[in-house]
């Protein structure tokens, strides 16, 4: 929490630590080798952490409910694998389903009043699916419903 400098490491834009745009590590950070590689290593991989964050920002910007909405945690639909919540803004609602597990999981969100999958994030070729109120979530995926 307060003392976690390794969690605040900057993006490796290059494998050359003296390249333009490279940041110094935060004070107190050890000599941690980042396992995801540099921008050059990640830019062409659609499932890289770089592209995941880029897509996350794009989705947030596309849906005001995500950026500015009020949050309701759907505890009855959440468990040790899935986190489900709704966000509402100006009369519009989205449902966000996060699978934080390395295993696939399903969620029945038919009672939340949404009918369409409008965005997703995935960390592999396996994509989330939504049909008849059931979200099928591969490992480490996110599904946005509206």
Specify the residue positions occupied by each region the protein language model found.
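Beta-strand-rich binding/interaction modules
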Residues: 104-124
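Loop/helix patches that line or flank the sugar-binding groove of alpha-linked glycan CAZymes
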Residues: 1-105, 111
């Amino acid at each position: 929490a307060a003392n976690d400098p390794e969690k605040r490491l900057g993006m490796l834009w290059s494998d050359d630590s003296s390249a333009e745009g490279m940041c110094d590590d935060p004070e107190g950070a050890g000599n941690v080798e980042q396992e995801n590689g540099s921008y050059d290593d990640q830019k062409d991989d659609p499932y890289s952490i770089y592209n995941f964050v880029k897509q996350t920002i794009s989705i947030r910007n596309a849906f005001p409910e995500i950026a500015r909405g009020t949050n309701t945690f759907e505890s009855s639909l959440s468990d040790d694998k899935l986190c489900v919540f709704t966000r509402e803004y100006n009369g519009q609602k989205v449902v966000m389903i996060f699978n934080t597990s390395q295993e696939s999981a399903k969620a029945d969100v038919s009672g939340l009043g949404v009918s369409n999958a409008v965005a997703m994030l995935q960390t592999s070729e396996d994509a989330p699916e939504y049909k008849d109120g059931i979200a099928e979530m591969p490992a480490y995926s996110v599904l946005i419903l509206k």
